[in-house]
């Protein structure tokens, strides 16, 4: 019998207007009375929790950053993985030659080198604030980053994905969370591994879990 329900946000629960329908909200509310509800997103933790608070007035066990961060209401963040500083430096220096927008996430804060259309659009989509840091490469080279996100056309990102997988395959995972978003996260990170971590922490059985998702980054949860 299923008693744990895991929901992706963008493209799954959130509609084209980035809203959860009243019908879906009521279903999740009913589920949460007798079962466990988990949200699993590529979004920042603050962005995911904001959605939960907006529609449900509280937070739930949450997988953020495509598995790099795990949160539970009782304790806060219980998992926080990062791309190491030296790896982040190598990747950013490499992708900059392709003239693609890149952004980084440090301590659940969004950073961009430039205040451009891409970062403004992303911040609006995710309902988060951002900081412009012209020396962002220098910053990630010192402290690392939870993830790196590239934003460009689907075709350009498909090509970049192939290139990055060949060059950095042993140190990071590279996958798309949206046609125009290419995610770069620590090698040991994905939504499936984060779900396994949460399942073991909470004492849930694998056969009790059902997952809802729509994109490449959600496949790891189905495989788990």
In which residue ranges do the predicted regions lie?
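Asp-based phosphoryl-transfer active-site loop
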Residues: 2-18, 91, 222
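Short, flexible loop segments at the rims of nucleotide/cofactor-binding pockets, characterized by
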Residues: 14-18, 39-40, 80-81, 126, ...
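Active-site phosphate-binding/coordination module
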Residues: 21-119
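Short active-site oxyanion
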Residues: 34-37, 58-60, 147, 207-208, ...
């Amino acid at each position: 019998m299923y008693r744990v329900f895991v929901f992706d946000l963008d493209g799954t629960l959130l509609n084209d207007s980035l809203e959860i329908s009243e019908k879906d909200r009521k279903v999740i509310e009913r589920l949460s009375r007798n079962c466990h509800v988990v949200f699993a997103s590529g979004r920042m933790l603050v962005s995911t929790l904001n959605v939960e608070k907006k529609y449900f007035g509280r937070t739930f066990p949450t997988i953020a950053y495509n598995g790099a961060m795990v949160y539970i209401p009782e304790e806060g963040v219980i998992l926080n993985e990062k791309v190491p500083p030296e790896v982040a430096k190598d990747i950013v220096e490499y992708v900059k030659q392709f003239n693609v927008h890149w952004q980084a996430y440090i301590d659940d804060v969004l950073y961009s080198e430039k205040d451009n259309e891409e970062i403004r659009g992303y911040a609006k989509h995710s309902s988060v604030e951002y900081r412009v840091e012209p020396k962002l490469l220098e910053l990630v080279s010192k402290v690392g980053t939870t993830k790196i996100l590239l934003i460009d056309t689907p075709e350009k990102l498909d090509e970049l994905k192939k290139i990055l997988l060949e060059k950095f395959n042993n140190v990071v995972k590279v996958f798309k969370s949206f046609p125009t978003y290419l995610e770069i996260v620590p090698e040991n990170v994905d939504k499936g591994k984060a779900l396994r971590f949460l399942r073991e922490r909470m004492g849930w059985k694998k056969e009790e879990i059902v997952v809802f998702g729509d994109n490449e980054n959600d496949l790891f949860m189905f495989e788990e």
